[in-house]
Regions:
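Conserved AMP-binding A3 loop
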Residues: 1-22
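Gly/Ser/Thr-rich phosphate-binding loop
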Residues: 59, 76, 81-89, 98-157, ...
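Conserved S/T- and glycine-rich ATP-binding loop of Class I adenylate-forming
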Residues: 3-6, 38, 44, 79, ...
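Short beta-strand->loop structural element characteristic of the AMP-binding/adenylate-forming
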Residues: 11-14, 40-41, 62-69, 136
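Conserved AMP-binding/adenylation subdomain of ANL enzymes
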Residues: 21-37, 45-85, 96, 100
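AMP-binding/adenylate-forming catalytic core of the ANL superfamily
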Residues: 169, 175, 189-194, 200, ...
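Acidic/polar alpha-helix N-cap and adjacent early helical turns
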Residues: 335-351
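Active-site glycine-centered loops adjacent to acidic/histidine catalytic or metal-binding residues
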Residues: 140, 161, 221, 245
Length: 351
């Protein structure tokens, strides 16, 4: 099974039947039953579509409807036509659905459960508008199964739930030393069940050794543990930025940009700075029929973010580069860098 390839070339992950079952089991990521019909809009050559979509339903004795692609305009028509009752939905997909013009038919459908990854900030408004009864969320990876889970009814924005009992989990610094509670660190995992994580990367022995260093599987993702024990996703380690001596989460900057009414989609990346750290570039897709003034967007962010997290550059794009699984290819945006079309607000001097 190949990874999504968001940070570079896709890696072939050697998986076992136990690995696939542990990821897809309805006992882990939902309460699918024999009379359920899952809607699958993600490709079957990655774990989201195949394991969390089709396998999850088949293990429960249910059925799956596999569509060629996700479409925000026809989504609820498809749900009604096929009688779908639950689905795996990326947070970006939920946002696209939420941005569609309201309709009297928004609540006339059979969908009752959604596994949303990650949970969109407007979760309550989404559930109210579309009449979704239960929402769950989870964190998983091709290499290591479903590790963190917020069961149905317990999902909330910015958090991914609690560790599964059959995994050992730690948050560590760059030296693999466990960080204090409340501090951000890389999630590393070990399984208590044999064969429920990957056997290694296909024909990539050095990458296998690196990801398994010190006998822990390194996820490459940064988290912190909230006051209530919920695990909060911070960023991909490769997507995190360093600016003005501070660590900056692209995920947190994107979350605030998405609050602007003219923004349909955004990706934030670090670009080289003359100060040897990172400048921040926000690549924005504007909602159809609306306009966005980059200077106004930055003024909007000035009121919502610390100064060191506000982007220097803003560029409006027709679309963001994505993988077949609809994940944004940030590496492509980093390689593209700052173009002449980008709005540039030089950084303010700080005494």
């Amino acid at each position: 099974m190949y990874t999504s390839g968001t940070t570079g070339p896709s890696k072939g992950v050697r998986v076992t039947q136990a690995h696939a079952y542990g990821y897809a089991s309805p006992a882990v990521i939902g309460r699918a039953q024999a009379d359920d019909v899952s809607l699958v809009t993600l490709p079957l050559f990655h774990i989201g579509g195949q394991w969390a979509g089709v396998y999850n339903s088949l293990i429960a004795g249910g059925s799956s409807v596999v569509l060629p692609r996700f479409s925000a305009t026809s989504y609820w028509d498809d749900v009604r036509h096929y009688g779908c009752t639950y689905t795996l939905m990326l947070g970006a997909m939920a946002n696209f659905l939420f941005q569609q013009p309201p309709s009297d038919a928004d609540r006339r459908h059979t969908m009752r459960q959604v596994l949303m990854v990650p949970v969109m900030p407007q979760l309550d408004a989404f559930r109210e508008r579309f009449g979704i009864g239960e929402v769950a969320t989870a964190y998983g990876l091709t290499e290591g199964s479903t590790v963190l889970v917020a069961p149905l009814g317990q999902a909330r924005p910015n958090a991914v739930g609690l560790p599964r009992g059959d995994f050992e989990v730690r948050l560590v610094d760059e030296h693999d030393v466990e960080v204090p509670r409340g501090k951000a660190g890389e999630l590393v995992i070990r399984t208590r069940d044999p064969w429920s994580v990957m056997d290694g990367y296909h024909e990539m022995p050095e990458a296998t050794v690196n990801v398994w260093r010190n006998q822990w599987l390194h996820t490459g993702d940064a988290f912190r543990i909230d006051d209530d024990g919920q695990w909060v996703f911070i960023d991909r380690m490769k997507d995190a930025m360093r600016r003005r001596g501070e660590n900056v989460s692209s995920f947190e900057v994107e979350r605030e940009i998405m609050e602007h009414p003219a923004v349909l989609e955004v990706a934030v990346v670090g670009v080289p700075s003359a100060a040897t750290e990172d400048d921040i570039l926000a690549c924005v897709v504007v909602r159809p029929g609306m306009q966005l003034d980059p200077a106004e967007l930055l003024a909007f962010l000035d009121r919502r973010l610390p100064y060191f997290m506000v982007p220097r550059y803003v560029e409006c794009l027709d679309a963001l580069p994505k993988t077949p699984t609809e994940k944004i290819r940030k590496q492509a945006l980093r390689e593209r860098g700052v173009t002449p079309a980008a709005f540039d607000r030089p950084p303010r001097r700080v005494a």
